[in-house]
Structures are given as structure tokens and as C-alpha cells.
Amino acid sequence: MTDIKSGGDNGKLLYCSFCGKSQHEVRKLIAGPSVFVCDECVELCNDIIREEISEISPKESKEALPSPIEIRESLDEYVIGQDHAKKVLAVAVYNHYKRLRNGDNHNGIELGKSNILLIGPTGSGKTLLAQTLARLLDVPFTMADATTLTEAGYVGEDVENIIQKLLQKCDYDVEKAQRGIVYIDEIDKISRKSDNPSITRDVSGEGVQQALLKLIEGTVASVPPQGGRKHPQQEFLQVDTSKILFICGGAFAGLDKVVEQRNHTGTGIGFGAEVRGKDQEISLTDRLADVEPQDLVKYGLIPEFIGRLPVLATLRELDEAALIQILQEPKNALTKQFTALFDMENVELEFRSDALHAIARKAMDRKTGARGLRSIVEAVLLDTMYELPSMENVSKIVVDENTIKGESKPIVIYDSKQEQAASE
């Protein structure tokens, strides 16, 4: 075989026998017995061969699966509190990936799938726990909002779009997607609107639960490649959802009353009712910790759907002390993030202890949990972050309780040495 760089012996223009490009359109043209191939076609053939080989012998991950204790310790670095929920998640996730590594069938015993239901107030850390798990295990992760889902054929988002989003996260690598984690938020919002069957179809409530059943339990979903629309002549990607871990989360507002009603059935009403003192009041967290499947059915989830989420974890309502910890202790704590932002301007940022308490109290008053902390700090530091890049000789910004309450602006401390040098 020879490399052709110019015209043939008779000056005739030569073309690639595969793609038809002339020798002037490519870098190299290789000649064989009465055929020619260009460098671009050679590269394309190499890609095809590499892809075929990788499909025949996929690389198995040899990395050791972290133990439940190691998973819990990693969660502790990013999520404050919620000890019971972390333990439940660590065991469920470990068992799920152990099942994937060793096969669904062990010594003739078929191993079931353990999807997870997280119940907890807004801002208690449900989404953060799921995100942190995916990052720790280095698997694809996607989130879906249950309120946008509808049954197939109705206006809204089809449940199979969830799998499409997961594929997008890993460049449509099906094998990788099948080891991923899907978090479905606001799952309580698709509860059945009524205990009684209705003649009108509930396409965003019970209908979505029915549509999610097979997906969560395990089915082979047909997903159009690269996000295209479905049409009959199209080739679909086949994704086995039995290997995907589904975590569903919701605040379940009002579920505590369902639990309380079950626990105090028959205590009487009116003069016969049981009267409890203030010290006997049960907290929201303690009531939710006592949730049973029958309570979820009464709330509006269908029994079949609850059966597909066998692992239940309840998250505690965050108190002031926990919110202060969240502000300071995790690896990506909010105060650390803002300190880093100010450090880029060569300015030190200090949050005094009374400021942290004031931020936590404000978040509790708003009932936004940890989710509301950032908006409070952003609002307080807005003017400072706006003016700081144009200011000179600033060495430190101090935020105290009065700043959080809106009674004063952050304290600005100037570099005295630079000021003295400027005055001289």
C-alpha cells in the first residue's frame, strides 16, 4: 500500500473508494490494489472497531463498594443531623449496588429492589442527601419534579422523560445510566385527590402513580436517542430500570394529622375527649417518625405505589442549633462559600456568632429550613457585594446581628497601613 499525496502517474485525480472525497479534500490517500482509502475513513473505522470491542467486553468497575459506615461518614461531611435517615439510606444504597455487582440471583434466591421514600419538612435535606449519595458513588444522577408529570398522552411531562434526562447526564451511555440514581421530588403532590373512585380521570394524581409503578419496579423503557421525538421508524435505546435506584421525597404536609388520628382513635370527642397539656404535645418530627403504610394510603398514595418504595426514612425538622451547624460545618457550608467569594476580592468576611443565630431564627420564622439560609445571606450582603469591587483599601467586612435584622449595614474595616501610606 502506498501513500498518495499528489496526482497519479498519469495526472488523474484520485478519489477515496469509501467516501468519494478527492485527494485534495483529505490529508492523506492510501492506495491499495485498484482501491483508495482516505485518512478520515481510516479514523472512522478505528472508532467503529473500538466501540464494538467495548460492547463485547464492557469494563467492570473494580473499585471497592464503600461500606454503610463509610457512606454514612461521607454524608456527614455535607449534611448536618438526620442520623437515622443517613443510616437507612446508607444500608439501602449499599444493598442496591451490592445486588448490581453480584447479580439479581444469588444461590437461587432472587434479590428484590429497595427503592426509597424520604419524608420530611421543606429544607430538611432530602434533595441534598440524594445528590451527595450520587456524587459519593460516582453514578449519574437526575432530579424530576412529580408535579410536572402526567400520564402518557396528556399535556405535561411523560414519566419516561425521567430516563431520558438520566441518559443525557451520561451522554446516552445506557450501561452507565442503568447504574444511576433518580430523585423524584414533591412525590406527595401526586396523591389521589379523593378516597372514592371518580368518573373523571385523575391524570396528574393517581394516573401518574400508575404510570410510575412499572418504571420504579423495573421495566425496559424505550427512549428515543439524543432527545428526539418518538416515531414508528425510529430506533430506541432500551434502558433496564430495574438497575436504577429511585429515591422519592416529599414534605407530606398534613400527614402528621393522619398519624395522630390513627394513634388516638377512640379517645372520644367533646367532654369525652382526651385533654393533653402543653408538655404532652407531640412534635411534628415524632409524629412523622411513626408513619406506617396505611397512613400513606389514607393520605392518597395507592397501595401498589407504596409497595414499590419499601425503604422509608423520615427526616427531622431542623432546629436553630442544626441550622447554625449547617451555616458553618459542612464542606460546602454557606459561610465558607461567601468567605471564598470575598477572598477573591482580597477581603476577609466575618460572621459573628449573634449573626448566625439571627440568620437561623429568621429561617425558622419563614419555615423554609436550610433552603432559606442562602436567600437571607444574599439579601444582607447584596449592597456590599455591589459596592466592594469599586472600593479601595478594604481589608474586612463584619456581619453582626443588627445587620441581619436590617438595623445597620455590614461593618467595613479599612487597611490602616495602606490609608497611612496614601496620606503621606
UniProtKB/Swiss-Prot annotation:
Residue ranges constituting the ClpX-type ZB domain according to the UniProt record: 4-57
Keywords, alphabetical: ATP-binding, Chaperone, Metal-binding, Nucleotide-binding, Zinc
GO cellular component entries: HslUV protease complex
GO terms (BP aspect): cell division; proteolysis involved in protein catabolic process
Binding site for Zn(2+): C16, C19, C38, C41
Manganese recorded as keyword: no
SMART domains (alphabetical): AAA, ClpB_D2-small, zf-C4_ClpX
Coiled coil: none
Pfam families assigned: AAA_2 (PF07724), ClpB_D2-small (PF10431), zf-C4_ClpX (PF06689)
Gene3D superfamilies membership: 1.10.8.60, ClpX chaperone, C4-type zinc finger domain, P-loop containing nucleotide triphosphate hydrolases
Gene Ontology molecular function: ATP binding; ATP hydrolysis activity; ATP-dependent protein folding chaperone; protein dimerization activity; unfolded protein binding; zinc ion binding
Superkingdom to which the source organism belongs: Bacteria
InterPro entries recorded: AAA+_ATPase (IPR003593), ATP-dep_Clp_protease_ClpX (IPR050052), ATPase_AAA_core (IPR003959), Clp_ATPase_C (IPR019489), Clp_protease_ATP-bd_su_ClpX (IPR004487), ClpX_bact (IPR046425), P-loop_NTPase (IPR027417), Znf_CppX_C4 (IPR010603)
Binding site for ATP: P121, T122, G123, S124, G125, K126, T127, L128
Subunit structure: Component of the ClpX-ClpP complex. Forms a hexameric ring that, in the presence of ATP, binds to fourteen ClpP subunits assembled into a disk-like structure with a central cavity, resembling the structure of eukaryotic proteasomes.
HAMAP family xref list: ClpX
PANTHER family: ATP-DEPENDENT CLP PROTEASE ATP-BINDING SUBUNIT CLPX-LIKE, MITOCHONDRIAL (PTHR48102:SF7), ATP-DEPENDENT CLP PROTEASE ATP-BINDING SUBUNIT CLPX-LIKE, MITOCHONDRIAL-RELATED (PTHR48102)
NCBIfam families to which the protein is assigned, alphabetical: clpX (TIGR00382), PRK05342.1 (NF003745)
Stated family: Belongs to the ClpX chaperone family.
Function: ATP-dependent specificity component of the Clp protease. It directs the protease to specific substrates. Can perform chaperone functions in the absence of ClpP.
Protein name: ATP-dependent Clp protease ATP-binding subunit ClpX
